[in-house]
């Protein structure tokens, strides 16, 4: 297996808190979350700020691993963060993200998230 793409992102949780405080939280949520994520948001076990911060960070990392960032038709909502029964994070690729991933001939994806009081960090790796 060889690495096809790597993306990493670190995010200040205070940045997300400021967005929410400035009454932009709902608009921001609708911009970065998929329909599935919007539906689970009210029932999330994490606090609202960390929920958004983790998703924003992992989607930024994934867009970097795809080699484009959020452009060329790729939207934040084309990526969904999920967790398996053990809590291990994984991504679902929808619409444009799915097309881009297939064009890279990606066979395996790896996701890791870490969050502390002030920061969230995400890394995404694609392999053939």
Swiss-Prot record:
Keywords (A to Z) from UniProt: Cytoplasm, Fatty acid biosynthesis, Fatty acid metabolism, Lipid biosynthesis, Lipid metabolism, Magnesium, Metal-binding, Transferase
Pfam families assigned to the protein according to its UniProt record, in alphabetical order: ACPS
Top-rank taxon: Bacteria
InterPro entries found in the cross-reference section: 4-PPantetheinyl_Trfase_dom, 4-PPantetheinyl_Trfase_dom_sf, ACPS, Ppantetheine-prot_Trfase_dom
Compartment(s): Cytoplasm
Broad enzyme group: transferase
Entry cofactors: Mg(2+)
Catalytic activity: apo-[ACP] + CoA = holo-[ACP] + adenosine 3',5'-bisphosphate + H(+)
Chief localization: cytoplasm
Binding site for Mg(2+): 9, 60
Keyword Nucleotide-binding appears in the UniProt entry: no
GO biological process assignments: fatty acid biosynthetic process
GO CC terms of this entry: cytoplasm
GO terms of molecular function: holo-[acyl-carrier-protein] synthase activity; magnesium ion binding
Matches recorded under SUPFAM superfamilies: 4'-phosphopantetheinyl transferase (SSF56214)
EC number(s) recorded for this UniProt protein: 2.7.8.7
Function, in words: Transfers the 4'-phosphopantetheine moiety from coenzyme A to a Ser of acyl-carrier-protein.
Family: Belongs to the P-Pant transferase superfamily. AcpS family.
Protein name stated in the entry: Holo-[acyl-carrier-protein] synthase
Source taxonomy: Bacteria, Pseudomonadati, Pseudomonadota, Gammaproteobacteria, Enterobacterales
Underlying gene: acpS
């Amino acid at each position: 297996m060889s690495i096809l793409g790597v993306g990493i992102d670190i995010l200040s949780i205070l940045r997300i808190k400021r967005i929410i405080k400035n009454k932009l939280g709902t608009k921001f949520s609708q911009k970065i979350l998929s329909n599935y994520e919007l539906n689970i948001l009210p029932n999330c076990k994490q606090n609202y700020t960390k929920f958004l911060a983790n998703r924003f960070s992992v989607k930024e990392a994934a867009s970097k691993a795809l080699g484009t960032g959020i452009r060329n038709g790729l939207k934040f909502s084309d990526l969904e963060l999920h967790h398996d029964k053990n809590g291990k994070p994984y991504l679902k690729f929808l619409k444009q993200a799915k097309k881009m991933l297939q064009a890279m001939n990606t066979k395996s994806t790896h996701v890791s998230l870490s969050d502390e009081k002030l920061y969230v960090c995400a890394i995404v790796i694609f392999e053939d």
